[in-house]
């Protein structure tokens, strides 16, 4: 609850910090857009919806969730698409049926979780057979700017 309260308080200022790293987000969105084209997407830890808003035109539909009601309020205030739905959810206990989504995205969050394995297991559960789990993470590099990591360490999950 303490972390959730932090993010609720931080929500209105979060976009200021994201704007400072537009280049890193733009590069990430370029990589993600082709992967979500015409697919059902679940974004976990959406924050203010930067990724969800950035891929909405490509995806068939997007469910974007976050544990912080404050973050979701900000994300909803910028939403203008019927394909995009925001809700407050704990990513360790998702209300969706098994195999509900063709793509699950959890960006910049695993290092913040007390139980990352539980969140990954839950993401795999709601992922359709043959689906795609995208878990990008930024790292601070150079002069305090965010830089995308060009390699990925993935935990294998069977979805068949």
Predicted regions: what they are:
Residues 117-129:
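A short glycine-rich, Lys/Arg-flanked "PGG" loop and its adjoining helix->strand segment in the class I
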Residues 105:
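A conserved beta-strand element that flanks and buttresses the S-adenosyl-L-methionine
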Residues 48-93:
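Class I SAM-dependent methyltransferase SAM/SAH-binding core
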Residues 108-109:
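Short catalytic micro-motifs in class I SAM-dependent methyltransferases
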Residues 135-137:
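Acidic carboxylate diad motif detector
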Residues 152-159:
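Conserved small/polar residues in nucleotide/adenosyl-binding loops
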Residues 1-36, 39-47, 50, 54, 141-142, ...:
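Conserved class I S-adenosyl-L-methionine
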